[in-house]
């Protein structure tokens, strides 16, 4: 029997956590039965299980993960919960699609806010908005397109010049920025662990339980794990690009690795070298070449930059070390006054990308469902995708299902080695086009 690949990062999540945050559950040992099995405890899997359990509290639902929620890819992102689409287009149809997308993202934020508030999840939730910044004036056309999109969507924003950005961010690296309210910043490891911890009672969670195979049999499904099997009526795949190794359909998404580093907390002396600053988050005008930055409530800087193909979900220690060197050079370029601030940890995580930006969402086959193809910025997006998939699977009437379906479906991706060559070429092209937005 051929088994699926298991995601593996040769590094540890860098977000500050205590033992209680980890929410460790036992691994599966033995053979069990359930009405539903959910594979993956990220934002889509957790929201799907939560909604399924609330629709029918009599269902028995099993959720498994190859790791635990607090160390999974969903815990490894930069902690931005974004409620606005970036790209709209010029036609009436494209504007309508963007408005639908905004409605989905904002409903995802509302659901997260409700759950965090209800269960008092300590995830450092801060509604502070975000900055979208350019380094080089040659990126002006891209920034102007973003302004035009915000105006079309009738969204509030503020334009800032380099000096104004310095007062907000403490760096003179950027020549221009756009501030938009409404973006939430969190510690994503604490958030996803808290969401998994507070699932309804009819959801049973198993950690360190990778799904090695998924088969349809006898009017149901069978999931093979390291030390057991799960037989269920139906299955939901919340495994993003690795779903192709479990699902009976063609590949439509690829896995990319991104890297982040976090500094030690700044000392009072080091903070004196900066303007008085509150927590903030910054996204670059070019997401592949540029750097995402954050300044946290406990006086740390986070740097997210560099993207590698990770088509089999594996990131090596060597790749992580290379990213750490880049991050330190980048941080010192942005903040020359903080040469004595060390990076405390560097880690990686994977995102799923599709060729046309559309999700992989819906029913893959009889009794098998999925919500994948997050294309980055997936906290709010995958939360609502999981909720709506549960509504669709259970025959619930929800007008946002149509909005989700309007996003389309991801295009076909070729198998390796053609996929490997295509992904490497696309990354090289994006880095070249955005080379002036690379700080180092």
Predicted feature descriptions by range:
Residues 1-36, 54-55, 59-60:
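Extreme N-terminal leader/targeting segments of oxidoreductases
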Residues 53-76:
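Glycine-rich FAD pyrophosphate-binding loop
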Residues 79, 119-126, 211-213, 229-269, ...:
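Active-site substrate-recognition segment that forms the wall
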Residues 83-162:
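Dinucleotide-binding Rossmann-like beta1-alpha1 core, especially the glycine-rich loop
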Residues 101-106, 133-142, 178-197, 206-208, ...:
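Short beta-strand to alpha-helix junction loop
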Residues 122-132, 164-194, 306:
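Helix-loop-beta segment of a Rossmann-like dinucleotide-binding subdomain
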Residues 148, 173-233:
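Helical element adjacent to the flavin cofactor pocket in flavoenzyme catalytic cores
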Residues 309-429:
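C-terminal catalytic lobe of FAD-dependent flavoproteins
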């Amino acid at each position: 029997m051929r088994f699926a690949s298991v995601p593996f990062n040769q590094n540890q999540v860098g977000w500050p956590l205590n033992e209680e945050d980890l929410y460790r559950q036992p691994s599966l040992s033995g053979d069990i039965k359930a009405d539903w099995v959910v594979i993956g405890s990220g934002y889509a899997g957790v929201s799907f299980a939560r909604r399924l359990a609330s629709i029918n509290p009599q269902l028995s639902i099993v959720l498994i993960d190859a790791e635990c929620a607090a160390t999974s890819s969903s815990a490894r992102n930069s902690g931005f919960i974004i409620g606005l689409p970036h790209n709209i287009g010029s036609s009436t149809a494209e504007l309508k699609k963007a408005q639908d997308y905004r409605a989905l993202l904002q409903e995802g934020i509302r659901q997260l806010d409700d759950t965090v508030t209800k269960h008092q999840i300590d995830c450092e939730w801060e509604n502070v908005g975000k900055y979208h910044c350019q380094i080089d004036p040659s990126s002006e056309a891209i920034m102007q397109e973003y302004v035009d999109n915000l105006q079309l969507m009738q969204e509030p924003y503020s334009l800032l010049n380099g000096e104004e950005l310095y007062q907000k961010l403490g760096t003179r690296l950027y020549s221009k920025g756009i501030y938009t309210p409404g973006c939430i910043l969190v510690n994503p490891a604490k958030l996803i662990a808290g969401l998994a911890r507070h699932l309804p009672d009819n959801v049973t969670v198993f950690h360190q339980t990778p799904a090695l195979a998924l088969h349809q049999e006898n009017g149901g499904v069978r999931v093979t794990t390291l030390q057991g099997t799960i037989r269920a009526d139906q299955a939901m795949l919340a495994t993003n690009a690795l779903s192709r190794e479990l699902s009976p359909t063609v590949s439509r998404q690829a896995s990319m690795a991104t890297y982040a580093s976090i500094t030690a907390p700044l000392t009072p002396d080091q903070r004196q070298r900066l303007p008085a600053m509150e927590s903030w988050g910054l996204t670059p005008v070019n997401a592949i070449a540029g750097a995402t930055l954050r300044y946290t409530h406990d006086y740390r800087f986070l740097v997210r930059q560099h993207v590698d193909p990770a088509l089999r979900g594996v990131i090596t220690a060597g790749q992580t070390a290379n990213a750490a060197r880049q991050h330190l050079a980048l941080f010192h370029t942005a903040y020359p006054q903080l040469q004595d601030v060390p990076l405390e940890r560097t880690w990686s995580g994977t995102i799923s990308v599709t060729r046309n930006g559309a999700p992989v969402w819906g029913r893959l086959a009889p009794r098998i469902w999925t919500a994948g193809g997050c294309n980055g910025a997936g906290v709010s997006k995958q939360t609502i995708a999981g909720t709506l998939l549960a509504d669709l699977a259970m025959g619930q009437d929800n007008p946002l299902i149509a909005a989700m379906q309007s996003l389309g479906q991801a295009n076909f991706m070729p198998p390796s080695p053609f996929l490997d060559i295509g992904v490497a070429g696309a990354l090289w092209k994006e880095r070249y086009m955005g080379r002036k937005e690379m700080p180092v």
